[in-house]
UniProtKB/Swiss-Prot annotation:
The keyword Nucleus does not apply. The gene is COX17. It comes from Sus scrofa (Pig). Keywords: Acetylation, Chaperone, Copper, Cytoplasm, Disulfide bond, Metal-binding, Mitochondrion, Phosphoprotein. Its main location: mitochondrion. A motif (Cx9C motif 1) lies at residues 25-35. The modification N6-acetyllysine is found at residues 17, 29. Interacts with COA1. Interacts with the chaperone CHCHD4; this is important for correct folding and the formation of disulfide bonds that stabilize the structure. Copper metallochaperone essential for the assembly of the mitochondrial respiratory chain complex IV (CIV), also known as cytochrome c oxidase. Binds two copper ions and delivers them to the metallochaperone SCO1 which transports the copper ions to the Cu(A) site on the cytochrome c oxidase subunit II (MT-CO2/COX2). InterPro entries: Cys_alpha_HP_mot_SF, Cyt_c_oxidase_Cu-chaperone. A motif (Cx9C motif 2) lies at residues 44-54. GO terms for biological process: mitochondrial cytochrome c oxidase assembly. This is Cytochrome c oxidase copper chaperone.
């Protein structure tokens, strides 16, 4: 565990392929998913919103 964080991801913004929603905002997605699993969706609104804001900042319309 923790090894993936040590490997820098290739800069996807410079490629011509659009970023897929599943790959965008991994930090907020991980925190959101962990919270939902542990506490239930109704207790994780702040993390869900943070992930949505990150996605919107990358141009996703959600």
């Amino acid at each position: 565990p923790g090894l993936a964080a040590a490997i820098p991801a290739p800069p996807e913004s410079q490629e011509k392929k659009p970023l897929k929603p599943c790959c965008a905002c991994p930090e907020t997605k991980k925190a959101r998913d962990a919270c939902i699993i542990e506490k239930g969706e109704e207790h994780c609104g702040h993390l869900i919103e943070a992930h949505k804001e990150c996605m919107r900042a990358l141009g996703f319309k959600i």
